[in-house]
UniProtKB/Swiss-Prot annotation:
InterPro entries noted in UniProt: Cation_efflux_TMD_sf, Tmem163
Similarity section: Belongs to the TMEM163 family.
Gene of this entry: Tmem163
Extracellular side: 109-115, 171-186, 238-254
Compartment(s) of residence: Cytoplasmic vesicle, Secretory vesicle, Synaptic vesicle membrane; Early endosome membrane; Late endosome membrane; Lysosome membrane
Stretches the record annotates as Disordered: 1-64
Modified residues (Phosphoserine): S11, S45, S54, S56, S60
Protein name from the UniProt record: Transmembrane protein 163
GO biological process, one term: myelination
Residue spans crossing the bilayer: 88-108, 116-136, 150-170, 187-207, 217-237, 255-275
Cytoplasmic side: 1-87, 137-149, 208-216, 276-288
GO molecular function: zinc ion binding
Species annotation: Mus musculus (Mouse)
Amino acid sequence: MEPALGSERRSPPGPGVPRPPPRGHAPSTAAPAPSPAPMSSSVQSDEERQPRISESGQFSDGLEDRGLLESSTRLKPHEAQNYRKKALWVSWLSIIVTLALAVAAFTVSVMRYSASAFGFAFDAILDVLSSAIVLWRYSNAAAVHSANREYIACVILGVIFLLSSICIVVKAIHDLSTRLLPEVDDFLFSVSILSGILCSVLAVLKFMLGKVLTSRALITDGFNSLVGGVMGFSILLSAEVFKHNAAVWYLDGSIGVLIGLTIFAYGVKLLIDMVPRVRQTRHYEMFE
């Protein structure tokens, strides 16, 4: 009977009976380890946000590398064609208006010895040419988002800007050196008012369309119209100042020099920006 008792003493306790802790030690209550999931999720979210930010910064560059403008992602096909037609209508209107103003301004320049009128006439001719380039730019309905076609138009505009600015500055400097005095009459007043108002309205329309179509050519054409509006008002300003104070005879020529230098600087900036892009996108002919 005793061996049986010994065997009962050696039998281990059941799993449901806990063992007492050793003396001198407090019972350990192990707290569950914090889950690393929130930290890892926050790290992942930061890592996901980082490439998104960099991708958004390089988004337009990626489109240009594929031969497309940013308007290809902003506008639906029917919206792009609608704005393209509006750009064509505005360009035709600009050609008609500025051509008439150019003839009138050249007449004023010859009859009244006005450097500003000559400068405006040259700028009006430039506006006619730039609007014709915009017509070519949007003549192809399938190329409304073509980056290469856009940049070629801008390069041509840059060259025209340089040539016209040289002519304006040379004419203005010649008038300043020979001390040509402008004459004031109702014809000069009418031309300056009409050119200032009409060119300013055309500039606003071109800026709005250029922003929607993300077209640097349209924005450049709008800048040229804005310069034409400023020159139209400058004719009125210089004529009125000379009428009340003949000592300020140089104001007309000085404005002509300033406007010529402004056009020259814009043309140089345009060529610096656009010539490399023409080379980058010349192999792409991706149209809608």
